[in-house]
A protein has these predicted regions:
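Glycine-rich phosphate-binding loop
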Residues: 57-96
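Short glycine/serine/threonine-rich phosphate/pyrophosphate-binding segments
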Residues: 22-26, 50-54, 73-82, 101-105, ...
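Glycine-rich phosphate/pyrophosphate-binding loop and the adjoining helix
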Residues: 139-181
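Glycine/charged-rich beta-loop-alpha catalytic/anionic-binding loops adjacent to active sites
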Residues: 11-12, 38-40, 89, 112-120
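N-terminal beta-loop-helix "entrance" segment that forms/cooperates
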Residues: 42-63
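Glycine-rich phosphate/diphosphate-binding loop of Rossmann-like nucleotide-binding domains
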Residues: 8-49
Length: 181
């Protein structure tokens, strides 16, 4: 896949959430995709309130050009697993801490403990930015331009850590560890 030859408005990633109350978390995935100029679509698809819509979304995603689906939900969090059971695309589940949650564990375990044959990649509780990055890494397996951008991003992360190490060393020159940096 070469994104330069693709229709820039055709979404490659679907970002779905069980409720609009999940938007504050799921927006993080959208922000990451925007940072890398990857087109996406964003909508609400409830596994419990709109099961037909959910099945329709999953069933048409690949034909619409979607390559990866990021699905976020709180509470029982069935959305990522049900989407994964209904399509062949990679699904990244984002467990969301909700008001009726058991410290988020219900969401985490609902997404993490999928049965054999129905894989869902799972990120941390409220970890939608990592879901966006994982979607980018999946897309980059067939896009050398995106792969190069991600390599630059990783180098920038290394530079930020190196700057923090230098700052600590400046603050505590006699107490700083001697590990290689």
């Amino acid at each position: 896949m070469n994104t330069k030859n693709m229709d820039a408005t055709k979404p490659l990633v679907g970002i779905i959430m069980g409720s609009d109350s999940d938007l504050s978390v799921m927006k993080q995935a959208a922000d990451v995709l925007q940072q890398f100029s990857i087109p996406f679509e964003l909508t609400v698809v409830s596994a419990h309130r709109t099961p037909q819509r959910m099945m329709e979304y999953a069933g048409t995603a690949a034909a619409r050009g979607i390559k990866v689906i990021i699905a976020g939900a709180g509470g029982a969090a069935h959305l990522p697993g049900m989407i994964a059971s209904s399509c062949i695309l990679p699904v990244i589940g984002v467990p969301i801490l909700s008001s009726n949650s058991i410290d988020g564990w219900d969401s985490v375990l609902s997404i993490l403990q999928m049965p054999s044959g129905v894989p869902v990649a799972t990120v941390a509780l409220n970890g939608a930015s990592n879901a966006g990055l994982l979607a980018l890494q999946i897309l980059a397996t067939s896009d050398t331009s995106l792969s190069a951008k991600l390599a630059i991003h990783k180098k920038e992360l290394q530079s930020k850590v190196a700057d923090k190490i230098k700052g600590l060393k400046d603050l505590y020159p006699n107490d700083f560890d001697q590990a290689p940096h």
